[in-house]
Every structure is written in structure tokens, then in C-alpha cells.
């Protein structure tokens, strides 16, 4: 059983100083990771932002949540990841996914291939990135990628390599994660326009996803750290309306998520009990909280982190 960890997903800031202050605040509260997503809208560029957060802190881990595989060649991404891990003293978590938001592909002028093709490319890229970060010299000729004598320098500090997170919600993505990941971000599936499919964000759906992971990983299941993204979170008595961000994602059915792993509302005691039960049932121990809840959820982080 993994101890509880909490990350905070932060994509924007009012200024450079504000970005640094947020990273330092997260570290002071006890968040384990400072996470940045990978979209082409109004957010900071993840690689540069993660390095800035790492430079401003001493123990806070930084991570991509998650890099879209199609946007970068595996060697280019492995080099960037190795450099961040080296310069941060070994604090990178490398999150990867197949890419899913149509507007990002349109902005890049890239074809938005069917999921099977995007997952094919990720399945080819994952072992290449893992081998490169582990210090191997890689020669490869495949359907999507070719590498000849490829290496990354300097080597990452973490050995054999920085932990890899794979994010996804469909059966094939979960099986891929079971094979290559150290951390699995179990996500509700999204429509190409970015709306969560809420039928995939229930406790019943979570049980099915974990069962797929368990079957695919076999004896290695216990080594996997299971993560979920929290769409909205709040402590009882905070005065903030419940489900405002969920309503943006799912309209009138948003309240159905209250009480699932994807929405955390209640007192510290209630939430502590709920997270303990979910860890016992599903194995979920790592929660990625939204930036707006960074300070509000501090009492929960302080109560559970490391337990």
C-alpha cells in the first residue's frame, strides 16, 4: 500500500513572481508535486514552467500532467526530461498520454487520428523514452519513429530513471500503463472537445478500471501508484459553491460526482475517512488537486500526506 501523496495542478500565474510564490507555497504546505498540463491554450509552457518551479524549491517534485505524446519526438522529450531531472536534483515525474484534445491538434496543424493510431504511437514511444532515460543507446526503426544511436546527456539523477506516469481511462491505455508506468493517472474518458464522460467517473467505473489494471499488471500491480485528478475540492464551511468547476465540465449531472474520487467535499475528518476507504478498495493514494484548492485543502494535505 502506497502512502498518500497530493499534487497540485497549476497552469497559469499572474507573473513570474506569482508562479514562484505558488510553488513555494505548495512546498510549505506539504504537497508532493507541482503539476502542469500540456495544452496549447492559455497556460504556461510546461517544460519551462516546471524547471522554474523546481529552481525555486528544494524538495517539491515537479511533473507533467501529462505530456501529449504526439507533440514531441521521443528523443527530444527524453532529453528535456533528463535535463529537468538533472538540474532539479532528481525531482521529475514524467507524465505521458496519447493526446486527446482536438483544438490542440488543430492549432498544431496536425491530423487528429483515431484513438487507436494515437495509442499505437504512444505504445511505440514509451519503451523508447524509458530506455533513453535509463542510459541506453537506442537504435530503432518502427512505424512512427526512427532513432539511430540515440542517447541523452546528462543522465537523470533518479535511477534507473525518473518515474513515468501514464494517464488514461480506456482499457487499452490502462493495459499500456500497467506495462510501462510507475504511476497510473486513472482518468475519466474525455470527448474530443474536452468534456468528461461522466458515466466513466463513478465508483463503479473506477472499480472496472482498477480491475483491468490489476489483471494486466499481475504480480506487479502492488508496485503501481494509482492517481486521480480531482475536478473540484473544498472543505465544509469554506463558503465556496460546491461543484462550480464540475458544472462547467458536466452541466446538470455534475453533482453525481460528489462522493467519487474525482470530487472531494467535506470536513477534514470526512475526507480522511473517505480517502482511506478508497485506498483500501481501489488502491488510490495519489490525488492531483486543482490550483484553486491549493490553500483550502492544506488541512487535508497536512493530515494525510505520508500516511
Model-derived features with residue positions:
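Active-site-adjacent structural elements that line small-molecule/cofactor binding pockets in enzymes
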Residues: 1-307
